[in-house]
Amino acid sequence: GWERGECMEIRPLDREIYAGKTFTARYRTNGYYEIRPSETGFQMDYVPFAEPTERSFDDVFFGEWLEDPIAFGAFEGEKLIGYVEGSIEGWNNRFRLSNICVLDFSERSRGVGTVLMKTIEQAAENTGARMLILETQSCNENAIAFYKKNGFEIVGFDLYAYSNDDPERHEVRIEMGKKLH
């Protein structure tokens, strides 16, 4: 559970307040999963980087492309320290986790992400979704390990989702899923 003396509270995020606001997600990584075609399918191997790397990307709360987003924040007082967001994909009855982020490196590995994951999983179950689904990158080894720890498995990937150079950039899109029913 939560390991700090302070009181952390999980609350629904108010769409009126947060919609359209941007944030930067950052992560550190020591390596990546190399995914390459083989004669009978695909081979996936972990490859360490020569030195640890930090990557980041900008994102937005309540992205316009989400069907009917549900979001929760982890707060210490009024300070937002973590965030999770998802929405039902009506066409296939899966709940897509569009974001889960503990915003400050110093707050990571303290259980915030796990509490947020349990909260959004319950919300997904309440929608009647058959499965949780999410996207991560082959170079985000900590995220992959976190999702596996929370019962997700790799269900697919796209070698060229972001650019024609994704394999060379070691940033291949990986889809991970967890059956709910």
Predicted regions span which residues?
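Generic detector of contiguous secondary-structure segments
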Residues: R11-T29, A129-I144
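Acetyl-CoA-dependent GNAT
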Residues: D14-Y18, T22-N99, L103-S106, M117-T119, ...
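Residue-level signal for alpha-helical context at structural boundaries
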Residues: P37-E39, V115, S138, D165
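Conserved glycine-rich acetyl-CoA-binding loop
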Residues: K79, L103-K118, Q122-T127, S138-A145, ...
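C-terminal "cap" of GNAT-fold acetyltransferases
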Residues: R130, Q137-I144, N150-E153, F157-H181
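Extreme N-terminal starter segment of soluble prokaryotic enzymes
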Residues: C7-E9
